[in-house]
């Protein structure tokens, strides 16, 4: 186990009011503010953690969900290692907009291989009683759009918040491991000048 910390940039994306700032603040500071205002532009917080023996510094970027802040938030997508697509289970429109957020991120982050980029989907505010999106609907969307992990969270009562960010780290590490395996597999036989066979990628 290496003592060197890996810096990972994670972006929280979703409609305004779904609780992105609250999730970030709950995870980093373990506080919840029911009177929190909408984010203007972007803000970020760091947290150090250890996941499966790897030391990681998670740089969590919270973005403004309103359309009028699009030009402020999109430059910060570049360099992201993972994207947490977030909706509120009591707001059906925020769920239906997930595909738009996914496309916006892929375009502005200039993702080269969208099929293998680590997205995690969060259904937030599960503490609310008047839910408009079922667990099954959300899971089906994840399966259809990239087989993404789906977690239901609540920043208010701290349901699955830590689990969600740790899952983001695991997804990034899994992709990195796969890439390393691919690179090792694509070796060149110097005698023949041809690439050795590889079952990867």
UniProtKB/Swiss-Prot annotation:
Membrane protein topology class: Lipid-anchor
Q: Which cofactors does this protein require?
A: Mg(2+)
Q: Where would you find this protein in the cell?
A: Cell membrane; Cytoplasmic vesicle, Phagosome membrane
Provide the catalytic activity annotation.
GTP + H2O = GDP + phosphate + H(+)
* UniProt GO molecular function: G protein activity; GDP binding; GTP binding; identical protein binding
Write out the entry's keywords from A to Z: Cell membrane, Cytoplasmic vesicle, GTP-binding, Hydrolase, Lipoprotein, Magnesium, Membrane, Metal-binding, Nucleotide-binding, Phosphoprotein, Prenylation, Protein transport, Transport
Q: Which domain of life is it from?
A: Eukaryota
Motif Switch 2: list the residue ranges: 64-78
Q: Which PROSITE patterns match?
A: RAB
Q: What family name appears in the similarity comment?
A: Belongs to the small GTPase superfamily. Rab family.
Stated role: The small GTPases Rab are key regulators of intracellular membrane trafficking, from the formation of transport vesicles to their fusion with membranes. Rabs cycle between an inactive GDP-bound form and an active GTP-bound form that is able to recruit to membranes different sets of downstream effectors directly responsible for vesicle formation, movement, tethering and fusion. RAB9B is involved in the transport of proteins between the endosomes and the trans Golgi network.
How is this protein named in the record?
Answer: Ras-related protein Rab-9B
Organism whose genome encodes this protein: Mus musculus
Query: What does the record give as the organism's lineage?
Result: Eukaryota, Metazoa, Chordata, Craniata, Vertebrata
């Amino acid at each position: 186990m290496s003592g060197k910390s890996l810096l990972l940039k994670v972006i929280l994306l979703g409609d305004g009011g779904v609780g992105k700032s609250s999730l970030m603040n709950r995870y980093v500071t373990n506080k919840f503010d029911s009177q929190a205002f909408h984010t203007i532009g972007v803000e970020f917080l760091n947290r150090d953690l250890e996941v499966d023996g790897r030391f990681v510094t998670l740089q969590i970027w919270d973005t403004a969900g309103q359309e009028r802040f699009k030009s402020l938030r999109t430059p910060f997508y570049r360099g992201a290692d993972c994207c947490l697509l977030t909706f509120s289970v009591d707001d059906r429109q925020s769920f239906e907009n997930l595909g738009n957020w996914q496309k916006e991120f892929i375009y502005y982050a200039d993702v080269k291989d969208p099929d293998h980029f680590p997205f995690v989907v969060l259904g937030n505010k599960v503490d609310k009683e008047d839910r408009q999106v079922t667990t099954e609907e959300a899971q089906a969307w994840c399966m259809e759009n990239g087989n993404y992990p789906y977690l239901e969270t609540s920043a208010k009562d701290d349901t699955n918040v830590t689990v969600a960010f740790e899952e983001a780290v695991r997804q990034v590490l899994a992709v990195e491991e796969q890439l390393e395996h691919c690179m090792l597999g694509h070796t060149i036989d110097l005698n023949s000048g041809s690439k050795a066979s590889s079952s990867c990628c």
